Amino acid sequence: MTVPAAPFGGDEKHLAPARSAVLWGLAAVTGLGLAVRFASLGVQSYHHDEVITVARVIPGSFLDMLRQVKGSESNPPLYYVVAWAWAKAFGTGEVGIRSLSALLGAATVPVAFLAAREAASARAGLIAAAIVAVNPMLIWYSQEARYYSMLVFFGAL
């Protein structure tokens, strides 16, 4: 009978410290991803595309929002459905609405880790997570009240 190899390399007695180090590393990289996305979230006012999002999610009722999205939006409605609920909970200011995208962008960091760990190793996972955490383009789109971060998040899954 063969015993499967430890998922982080090495034998069983070294497994716990290695796993702990990887988890702490992932937590640090994810924290960095959160920090850089939320640091300047409300610095700029809404731009044209974001105004479209706000106009879709501000209507009073859920059905009003769906009617607006159905009648004038070419993108799938999932982002607007989630953003509508998010705006009800966190407000319609720049930080309130953009925080959904920032959170989705930061949540992509551990997803990148899991994908790279599955494909290669825990070390590759940490490198991939670090790249996603500090990638300027991903940070930029994580600070916009648009569906881009949700698209990247689900694409990474």
Summary of predicted features, one role per range:
Residues 143-147:
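Short acidic/glycine- and proline-prone juxtamembrane loop motifs at membrane-interface regions
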Residues 77, 106-107, 133:
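Hydrophobic/small/kink-forming positions within alpha-helical transmembrane segments
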Residues 1-20:
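Membrane-interfacial, low-structure loops and terminal tails that flank and connect transmembrane helices
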Residues 81, 111-113, 130-134, 140, ...:
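Specific aromatic-rich, kink-prone transmembrane helix
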Residues 63, 70-71, 81-103, 136:
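Juxtamembrane segments of multi-pass membrane glycosylation machinery
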Residues 48-81, 85-86:
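Extracytosolic helix-loop segments that constitute the early lumenal/periplasmic catalytic or substrate-binding loops
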Residues 99-119:
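Transmembrane-helix motifs of polytopic, lipid-linked glycan transferases
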Residues 22-24, 28-32, 112-134:
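Transmembrane-helix signature of polytopic, membrane-embedded enzymes
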